[in-house]
């Protein structure tokens, strides 16, 4: 329902499933695909039975699951205006739309692989500095058809999937965790969603480049 309501909000320019916007922007609501394991970043009101006990974050193969939408926001204690292009090297927050908790990591051990736990934390979009992730990509901006990595700004692990699979109550879902080593397991791509129209800033920069 949260995603549907965004479509009805005045002034938004939606591009669900289309590719006519080159850059990813603040305020966009997207699904993120781990390109190595073909699963989308997912969360739900199911808590880890070990580690932090916080809300679990997993990877799912379903394309249609509404629990895989994440809102792109500025880093903790900042505001990133809607439509602002995300620069490579910029710290951001990813807020789970349906529960209002932020993608988060800390020095707890993940339950299946023994890597660093990744959870969803906070209330109504507000958590702490451990919710910040730096976008790693080539070029000036995060582009929609490009692969990116997300580096945890505090602990420096990379958001990863290596294929470990949960049993009940979330049978078939893959573990998402943090890893220190860069590999094919930590590449992500923006897929379905509601993409905000890029701001005038990007247009102005493009104009100056042409001059």
From Swiss-Prot:
InterPro entries named among the record's database cross-references: MIR_dom_sf, MIR_motif
Transmembrane segments: none
MIR domain sequence ranges: 21-75, 83-138, 139-193
SMART domains: MIR
Gene Ontology CC annotations of this record: extracellular region
Coiled-coil regions listed: none
Signal sequence range: 1-18
A Pfam family hit: MIR
PROSITE patterns reported for this sequence: MIR
Organism of provenance: Bos taurus
Compartments it resides in: Secreted
Keyword Signal part of the UniProt annotation: yes
Gene3D superfamilies the UniProt entry points to: 2.80.10.50
The protein, known as: Stromal cell-derived factor 2
Taxonomic lineage: Eukaryota, Metazoa, Chordata, Craniata, Vertebrata
């Amino acid at each position: 329902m949260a995603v549907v309501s965004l479509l009805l909000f005045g002034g938004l320019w939606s591009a669900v499933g289309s590719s006519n916007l080159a850059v990813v922007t603040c305020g966009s609501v997207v699904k993120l695909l781990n390109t190595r394991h073909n699963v989308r970043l997912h969360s739900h009101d199911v808590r880890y039975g070990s580690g932090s006990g916080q809300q679990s974050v997993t990877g799912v193969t379903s394309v249609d699951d509404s629990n895989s939408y994440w809102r792109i926001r500025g880093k903790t204690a900042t505001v990133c205006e809607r439509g602002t292009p995300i620069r490579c090297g910029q710290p951001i927050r990813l807020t789970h739309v349906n529960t209002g908790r932020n993608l988060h990591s800390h020095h707890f051990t993940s339950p299946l692989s023994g890597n660093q736990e990744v959870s969803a934390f906070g209330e109504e979009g507000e958590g702490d500095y451990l919710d910040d992730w730096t976008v790693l990509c080539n070029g000036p901006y995060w582009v929609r058809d490009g692969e990116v990595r997300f580096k945890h700004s505090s602990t420096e692990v990379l958001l990863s999937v290596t294929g470990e699979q949960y049993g009940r109550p979330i049978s078939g879902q893959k573990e998402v965790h943090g890893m220190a080593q860069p590999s094919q397991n930590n590449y992500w791509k923006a897929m379905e969603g509601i993409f905000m129209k890029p701001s005038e800033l990007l247009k102005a920069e493009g104009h100056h480049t042409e001059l």
